[in-house]
């Protein structure tokens, strides 16, 4: 028998949790039944706004262990020596679906990592694909609206989805990945992760390197066909979450090997493709993979809402030695993610335990809704001042970044219009069976989209490789 007795939020004993207070056994309820009022008022507010994207997620705690030396590229403390361990929290997710969506749907998967370092939290907010649909964040709300529910029917719309994707030819690379055999991972454990964006390393001698992060699963890649996924969804909508949770509970801890691709700052100008374009990858022949360490997940959360639903990842959270790049999608996310968290969780979401830094924090910010720490007590609230409080730290300033050009709404399609080379290369890397799966998956996904949209997609595919376009056309039953 538990010794935990029921109380109100104020700590008073609850004498009856079975019957509301009424005037007589059949009379009306009384307003003075404060336990009923408290219980129902809390119930009415239990649901917080869901994430606009990545709403359905699963999480786990673990560690990152350095296995190889990269200190010549970065002064970040978590990479400072071989054998160093850093605690972390990971949230996996589907992207387009709501909180109640099935895990085994054809979709990108989110792969967000919060490293609790001694220099602050570093959030690597990535996906299971190395590229994305867009390279300009101004179109991100449009992507969201295209893949979410139609405002009239409240149903997902292949017409809306494919009309948008095919109208942006730069999306073809990501579309090819999502429609391939890797579009439905068998589980979160059996997929790779990518930082996707170009970030930067700052070295001990204050030199800048451009960097991309890769996480390769040690469990091996496993995927589902459409038919296999449909059978799983019919019996278990939480298949990915169940697989992750159960594997950790039985001690079968999933692991990923971290690699980086590194490029000296000046070399970015020499590449034949745009190094800060999120719709493109860096070729391994140009920037080979460099092994860094191992990520292991070994502890499940105790409370899903507190630790997974309230987790807030923000690519703006970096530490000394890791920074940003001119990648426009990354720069757009630097604002959008924090802003979304302030709406969803409140301005003090950084105080929620799963989000809280584990190093000393001496932030300038105070007050605001749900401030639950000491709010800096009587410490003065302005800077500069005469008392040495809130001192800035110029030793951690980054080297200057050279930029050039006039301010304007530049059409990047005039700067780099090659959207087809890399999707074509990816297509030609596939086996004939994988290519056929790509054709058939695309045809099923396009569903009842109008023929003009289907023909537009076939045209985009043909520019990547004539065989790609011809195969999709055959699967769609189109005569070209």
Curated annotation (Swiss-Prot):
Ranges in a coiled coil: none
Entries under PROSITE patterns matching the protein: CATALASE_1, CATALASE_2, CATALASE_3
One BP annotation, GO: hydrogen peroxide catabolic process
Necessary cofactors: heme
Any single GO CC term annotated in Swiss-Prot or TrEMBL for this entry: cytoplasm
The protein's Enzyme Commission number: 1.11.1.6
Family the entry assigns: Belongs to the catalase family.
Protein name: Catalase
Species: Nitratidesulfovibrio vulgaris (strain DSM 19637 / Miyazaki F) (Desulfovibrio vulgaris)
Encoding gene, per UniProt annotation: katA
């Amino acid at each position: 028998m538990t010794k935990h007795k029921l109380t109100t939020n104020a700590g008073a004993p609850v004498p009856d949790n079975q019957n509301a207070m009424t005037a007589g056994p059949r009379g009306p309820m009384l307003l003075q039944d404060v336990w009923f009022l408290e219980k129902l008022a809390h119930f009415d507010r239990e649901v917080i706004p869901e994430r606009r994207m990545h709403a359905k997620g699963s999480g786990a705690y673990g560690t990152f262990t350095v296995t190889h030396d990269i200190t010549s590229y970065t002064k970040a403390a978590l990479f400072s020596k071989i054998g160093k361990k850093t605690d972390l929290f990971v949230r996996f997710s589907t992207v387009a679906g709501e909180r109640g969506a099935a895990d085994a749907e054809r979709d990108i998967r989110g792969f967000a990592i919060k490293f609790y370092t001694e220099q602050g939290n570093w959030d690597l907010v990535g996906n299971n694909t190395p590229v994305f649909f867009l390279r300009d964040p101004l179109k991100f709300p449009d992507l969201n609206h295209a893949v979410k529910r139609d405002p009239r029917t409240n149903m997902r719309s292949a017409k809306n989805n494919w009309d948008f994707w095919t109208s942006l030819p730069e999306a073809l690379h990501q579309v090819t990945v999502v429609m391939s055999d890797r579009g439905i991972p068998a589980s979160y454990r059996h997929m790779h992760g990518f930082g996707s964006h170009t970030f930067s390393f700052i070295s001990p001698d204050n030199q800048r390197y451009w960097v991309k992060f890769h996480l390769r699963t040690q469990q091996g890649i496993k995927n589902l066909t459409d038919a296999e996924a449909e059978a799983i969804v019919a019996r278990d909508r939480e298949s990915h979450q169940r697989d992750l949770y159960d594997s950790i509970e039985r001690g079968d801890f999933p692991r990923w090997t971290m690699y980086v691709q590194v490029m000296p700052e000046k070399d970015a100008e020499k590449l034949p493709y745009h190094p800060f374009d999120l719709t493109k990858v860096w070729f391994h022949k140009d920037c080979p993979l460099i092994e860094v360490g191992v990520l292991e997940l070994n502890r499940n959360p105790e409370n899903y809402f507190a630790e997974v639903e309230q987790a807030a990842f923000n690519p703006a959270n970096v530490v000394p030695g890791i920074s940003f790049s001119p990648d426009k999608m990354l720069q757009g996310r630097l604002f959008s993610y924090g802003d979304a968290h302030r709406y969803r969780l409140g301005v003090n979401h950084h105080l929620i335990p799963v989000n809280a830094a584990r190093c000393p924090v001496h932030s300038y910010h105070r007050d605001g809704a749900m401030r639950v720490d000491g709010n800096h007590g009587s410490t003065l609230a302005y800077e500069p001042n005469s008392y040495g409080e809130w001192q800035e730290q110029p030793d951690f300033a980054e080297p200057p970044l050279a930029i050039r050009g006039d301010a304007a709404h530049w059409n990047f399609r005039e700067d780099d219009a090659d959207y087809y080379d890399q999707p074509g290369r990816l297509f030609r890397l596939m086996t004939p069976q994988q290519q056929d799966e790509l054709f058939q998956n695309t045809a099923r996904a396009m569903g009842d989209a109008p023929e003009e949209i289907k023909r537009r997609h076939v045209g985009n595919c043909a520019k990547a490789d004539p065989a790609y376009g011809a195969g999709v056309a055959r699967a769609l039953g189109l005569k070209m």
